């Protein structure tokens, strides 16, 4: 059992007797109340989706499934194909990746964990931190130095990340895949 706060994209939880793949997590904290965790879920059996809200300390049944370390191989619409160290290939539906698809790029060497349910690859869990190149961002705003200045940037893979004002096109940045937050320039 994990708390709702410990659940991250790629995990599979049992809810109402069915396995659900966590596609996205969003944690909201308020000064007075406990953290609220909103999960975007996809039912493995019925292929339907939903959003559920939990308190941060709520216990959820995290299903322990078979997981394999794999690397991304290629995209064959609508499947992402991953390969293990023995060159076995596993297809994962693009819908099951959620926001993780924004971080998957050709030639990436990051080792991902592919999760299986009843012999079928159902989700992919990315490493906690990955490095990607910024392919587009606005130039820094001159003189705007009051506080922590942030701006949107597009990274290889097509995802958008909010980065510090000093980041330029061509910079490599480290991203936390659990939250989608910029960590540092590499």
From Swiss-Prot:
<comment type="similarity">
    <text>Belongs to the elongation factor P family.</text>
</comment>
<dbReference type="InterPro" id="IPR013185">
    <property type="entry name" value="Transl_elong_KOW-like"/>
</dbReference>
<comment type="pathway">
    <text>Protein biosynthesis; polypeptide chain elongation.</text>
</comment>
<dbReference type="InterPro" id="IPR014722">
    <property type="entry name" value="Rib_uL2_dom2"/>
</dbReference>
<dbReference type="InterPro" id="IPR020599">
    <property type="entry name" value="Transl_elong_fac_P/YeiP"/>
</dbReference>
<dbReference type="InterPro" id="IPR012340">
    <property type="entry name" value="NA-bd_OB-fold"/>
</dbReference>
<keyword id="KW-0648">Protein biosynthesis</keyword>
<dbReference type="InterPro" id="IPR011768">
    <property type="entry name" value="Transl_elongation_fac_P"/>
</dbReference>
<dbReference type="InterPro" id="IPR001059">
    <property type="entry name" value="Transl_elong_P/YeiP_cen"/>
</dbReference>
<dbReference type="GO" id="GO:0005737">
    <property type="term" value="C:cytoplasm"/>
</dbReference>
<dbReference type="Pfam" id="PF08207">
    <property type="entry name" value="EFP_N"/>
</dbReference>
<dbReference type="GO" id="GO:0003746">
    <property type="term" value="F:translation elongation factor activity"/>
</dbReference>
<dbReference type="InterPro" id="IPR015365">
    <property type="entry name" value="Elong-fact-P_C"/>
</dbReference>
<keyword id="KW-0251">Elongation factor</keyword>
<dbReference type="GO" id="GO:0043043">
    <property type="term" value="P:peptide biosynthetic process"/>
</dbReference>
<keyword id="KW-0963">Cytoplasm</keyword>
<protein>
    <recommendedName>
        <fullName>Elongation factor P</fullName>
    </recommendedName>
</protein>
<dbReference type="Pfam" id="PF01132">
    <property type="entry name" value="EFP"/>
</dbReference>
<dbReference type="Pfam" id="PF09285">
    <property type="entry name" value="Elong-fact-P_C"/>
</dbReference>
<comment type="function">
    <text>Involved in peptide bond synthesis. Stimulates efficient translation and peptide-bond synthesis on native or reconstituted 70S ribosomes in vitro. Probably functions indirectly by altering the affinity of the ribosome for aminoacyl-tRNA, thus increasing their reactivity as acceptors for peptidyl transferase.</text>
</comment>
<dbReference type="InterPro" id="IPR008991">
    <property type="entry name" value="Translation_prot_SH3-like_sf"/>
</dbReference>
């Amino acid at each position: 059992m994990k708390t709702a706060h410990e659940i991250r994209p790629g995990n599979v939880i049992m809810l109402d007797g069915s396995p659900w793949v966590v596609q996205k997590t969003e944690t909201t904290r308020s000064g007075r109340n406990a953290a609220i965790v909103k999960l975007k879920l996809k039912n493995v059996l019925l292929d339907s989706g939903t959003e559920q809200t939990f308190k941060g300390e709520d216990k959820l049944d995290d299903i322990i499934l078979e997981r394999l370390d794999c690397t991304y191989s290629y995209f064959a619409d609508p499947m992402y194909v991953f390969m293990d160290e023995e060159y076995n290939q596993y297809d994962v539906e693009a819908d099951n990746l959620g926001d993780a698809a924004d971080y998957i790029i050709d030639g990436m060497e990051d080792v991902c964990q592919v999760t299986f349910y009843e012999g079928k690859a159902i989700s992919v869990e990315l490493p906690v931190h990955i490095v990607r190149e910024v392919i587009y961002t606005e130039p820094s705003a001159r003189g705007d130095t009051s506080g922590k200045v942030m701006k949107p940037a597009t990274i290889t893979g097509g995802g958008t990340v909010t980065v510090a004002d000093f980041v330029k096109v061509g910079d490599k940045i480290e991203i936390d895949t659990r939250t989608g937050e910029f960590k540092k320039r590499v």
